[in-house]
Amino acid sequence: PIKSSAASDVYKRQKYLYSIADEGVEAFAIQPDGDLIPINKKWIGGMRGCYVELDDEDRYLFVGGYHDGRVSMMRLSEDGGVAEIADGIFHKGLGRGVAERASRPHVHCVKVTPDQKFLCAVDSGLDHVKIYRINYERGRIKLADILRCELDSGPRMIRFSVDGRFAYVLCELKNTVDVYKYYVEDDQPVFERVQSISTDYEDEGIACNASGIEHSADGKYLFVSNVGINDVIIYKIDKNTGMLTLDMETRISGDYPKALAVFPDGHHFVSLNHDSNEIRTFKINYEKKYCLMDARPVQVETPNCIYCLLYTSPSPRDRQKS
């Protein structure tokens, strides 16, 4: 097991897995049967991270630091291991809001734009998404723009549409998904907000914090989990405008759905219920607009993150080699 993992990402050819670890980041080789073999660990130049992200060509590993507001850029070696620190930037300043977490920077998520030109660092303490230009040749990141979110909105995560034209920023304090049109103009990133839709659609007066966000592989649906209400909201995505409409809501029968994942088939999702120490799987009926728990809960101590891979059984030749 990986000790105290907060986030993980997988090499695009599914050969290696990278995870947050107490020591910084850790690299693993993925075996044909899904087992993990440790490769190495590396310090990230700051306090413990909370999010990892790879570029599409698996050249660099980017790490976001919640506790110290640091964004780190790590080189990768040919054997899949993590090499030296290429670059690192500490976010500075004070948040504008009254919430305790807004007193200083907290980088909660780092995400490479679909065109691979920029790195988005979501800072829930500053209510910013800082956009860094990536220089792959030199191994450097440089601030290109700042997406300023609403006061005390607490931006937590960012995801991009399958076609790369739209960005979805999940705000955990405001309980919204902010939808942006994304494009590049004169070599500069442009984010135009086109919608802000609530994740607390019933507004029952229960304390609620939006927590997890993912989309289906076909790009037709966006999934959001809410802590407090303990539910998952499914939105339908308009392929032309990127805007969202509520499709269905499911109570997850667990406590604190910190993260979620959508299966590659798009007809199942899993909820990681951190405080009830379990993972629950649900089957989606899009036609009748409901979800049903599809299996018994899997007991996992305080789950933080999950990564879904389409598993292919090893061939007889591969089994003989192993």
Residue ranges and their predicted role:
Residues 42-45, 100-102, 147-151, 203-205, ...:
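Surface loop/turn motifs at the tips and blade-to-blade linkers of beta-strand repeat domains
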Residues 12-13, 56-57, 114-115, 162-163, ...:
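Residue-level detector of Asp-centered blade-edge/turn motifs that repeat once per structural unit
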Residues 87-100, 194-204, 300-303, 308:
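Surface-exposed loop and turn segments in beta-propeller and other repeat-based domains
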Residues 41-60, 64-107:
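Asp-box/WD-like beta-propeller blade repeats and closely related beta-sheet repeat scaffolds
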Residues 1-7, 11, 311-322:
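Single conserved hydrophobic/aromatic residue that forms the stacking wall/gate
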Residues 29-34, 75-82, 133-139, 181-189, ...:
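Short loop/turn segments immediately following beta-strands, especially the blade-tip
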